[in-house]
């Protein structure tokens, strides 16, 4: 059981490194113009699927276009992963938007505003 978790975690880290490198240096899709950050990768127990959570910085239009570009590049990314990482099955790449960073920034702004208001009251 623990061996599978270790293997899954190790594969997630390797995938994160390789996919980040591909997005930065190799994918030439003009839709991918916003800054993309891979926040997490979840690999299923059978190692057949990898959910790649991405945070995209930019306007709403840039986010939408960039996400569409990433989804269309999933096949290329899977092919390249198969060439670069030796494993029995190459996982299918599924991109998911991660809003946690935006959510955290909003909470931080709210807390700053509350602290500012509290300071004004004193």
Swiss-Prot record:
InterPro entries: KH_dom-like_a/b, RbfA, RbfA_dom_sf, Ribosome-bd_factorA_CS. GO terms for biological process: maturation of SSU-rRNA. Pfam families: RBFA. It comes from the Bacteria. One of its GO terms (cellular component) is cytosol. One of its GO terms (molecular function) is ribosomal small subunit binding. It is found in: Cytoplasm. Its main location: cytoplasm. Keywords: Cytoplasm, Ribosome biogenesis. One of several proteins that assist in the late maturation steps of the functional core of the 30S ribosomal subunit. Associates with free 30S ribosomal subunits (but not with 30S subunits that are part of 70S ribosomes or polysomes). Required for efficient processing of 16S rRNA. May interact with the 5'-terminal helix region of 16S rRNA. Belongs to the RbfA family. PANTHER family: RIBOSOME-BINDING FACTOR A, CHLOROPLASTIC-RELATED. Monomer. Binds 30S ribosomal subunits, but not 50S ribosomal subunits or 70S ribosomes. This is Ribosome-binding factor A. It comes from Caldanaerobacter subterraneus subsp. tengcongensis (strain DSM 15242 / JCM 11007 / NBRC 100824 / MB4). The lineage of its organism: Bacteria, Bacillati, Bacillota, Clostridia, Thermoanaerobacterales. The gene is rbfA.
């Amino acid at each position: 059981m623990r061996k599978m978790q270790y293997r899954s975690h190790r594969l997630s880290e390797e995938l994160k490194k390789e996919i980040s490198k591909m997005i930065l240096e190799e994918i030439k899709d003009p839709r991918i113009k916003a800054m993309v950050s891979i926040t997490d990768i979840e690999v299923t127990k059978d190692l057949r699927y990898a959910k790649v959570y991405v945070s995209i910085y930019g306007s709403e239009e840039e986010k939408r276009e960039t996400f569409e570009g990433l989804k269309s590049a999933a096949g290329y990314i899977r092919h390249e992963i198969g060439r670069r990482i030796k494993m029995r099955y190459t996982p299918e790449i599924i991109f998911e938007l991660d809003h946690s960073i935006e959510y955290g920034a909003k909470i931080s702004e709210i807390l700053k505003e509350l602290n500012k208001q509290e300071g004004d009251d004193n």
